[in-house]
Amino acid sequence: MERISLTIEKNLLKEVDEIINKERISRSEFIRRALEYYVKKYDWLSRIESKIGEITVIYNSKAVEDIVKLESQYKDIVIISLEIPFEGKIIRMIAIKGQRDRIIEFTNKLKGISSVELAQLTTISIE
């Protein structure tokens, strides 16, 4: 195995430490698992052209206008979206269907909106 050095935000490290204490694993094992998950997900996403899925977005009310505008720009892949207020934030579930690159582009633009805390893509392949 190779050794690497890593610099992360203090808050993120605190969250990692909470997880590793619950899971009873080392930081190294946690990071190894996270990297394996990311690589597998990236590899899987890169091999499939057409997808159907859902994007979960968590944000505050400042982002509503930007998200609605972005959805209209991607109406070729957005099937429907549902907005749910929850504990002072908004959770939006966006059903999507289309080409992989277009979906990834849309997801990345959602992530780029300043008031968006999370934009998580979940997809399945269309055979």
Swiss-Prot record:
InterPro entries registered for this protein in UniProt: Acetolactate_synth/TF_NikR_C, ACT-like_dom_sf, Arc_rbn_hlx_hlx, CopG, CopG/NikR_regulator, Ribbon_hlx_hlx, TF_NikR_Ni-bd_C
GO molecular function, one term: DNA binding
Keyword Transcription assigned: yes
UniProt keywords, alphabetically: DNA-binding, Transcription, Transcription regulation
Gene3D superfamilies (alphabetical): ACT-like. Chain A, domain 2 (3.30.70.1150), Met repressor-like (1.10.1220.10)
Alphabetical GO biological process terms: regulation of DNA-templated transcription
Cysteine-cysteine disulfides: none
Family per record: Belongs to the transcriptional regulatory CopG/NikR family.
Protein name as catalogued: Uncharacterized transcriptional regulator MJ0080
Species for this entry: Methanocaldococcus jannaschii (strain ATCC 43067 / DSM 2661 / JAL-1 / JCM 10045 / NBRC 100440) (Methanococcus jannaschii)
Taxon lineage: Archaea, Methanobacteriati, Methanobacteriota, Methanomada group, Methanococci
